Structures are given as structure tokens and as C-alpha cells.
């Protein structure tokens, strides 16, 4: 099965002492071997931040 469940976690929230926002999704392991980084909305910081794959 080429698709894998992933978790994207905010990289800026921990440095500021806020709760980390997380997004869940899937990725195709055959097309993207590295870790995914996306800009997603963080409701705790009220702005878009960089979210990195943690799983």
C-alpha cells in the first residue's frame, strides 16, 4: 500500500510556549520520500505557520 498516514505539527508553537496545532493526512511514499513541510493555519497563534511531518 503506497499511501501512509502522517501527522503535521506546528514548528513555531513550542518555541512560544503555546499548544501545538496538528493536522492529519496521507502522502504517497513512492512520490515523496522526504518529510513534508506545509504552511497551515494555527488557531492558537492565529496565523499561518510552518507545519512539519512528525510521523
UniProtKB/Swiss-Prot annotation:
A biological process term (GO) from this entry: translation
Keyword Calcium included in the entry's annotation: no
Gene3D superfamilies cross-referenced by the UniProt entry: Ribosomal protein L33 (2.20.28.120)
Gene Ontology molecular-function annotations: structural constituent of ribosome
Gene Ontology CC: one annotated term: cytoplasm
Keyword set, alphabetical order: Ribonucleoprotein, Ribosomal protein
A Pfam short name: Ribosomal_L33
Domain of life: Bacteria
Alphabetical list of SUPFAM superfamilies matching this protein: Zn-binding ribosomal proteins
InterPro entries in the cross-refs: Ribosomal_bL33, Ribosomal_bL33_sf, Ribosomal_zn-bd
Family under the similarity heading: Belongs to the bacterial ribosomal protein bL33 family.
Record NCBIfam families: PRK00504.1, PRK00595.1, rpmG_bact
Stored PANTHER family: 50S RIBOSOMAL PROTEIN L33, CHLOROPLASTIC, LARGE RIBOSOMAL SUBUNIT PROTEIN BL33C
Protein name per the record: Large ribosomal subunit protein bL33
Gene: rpmG
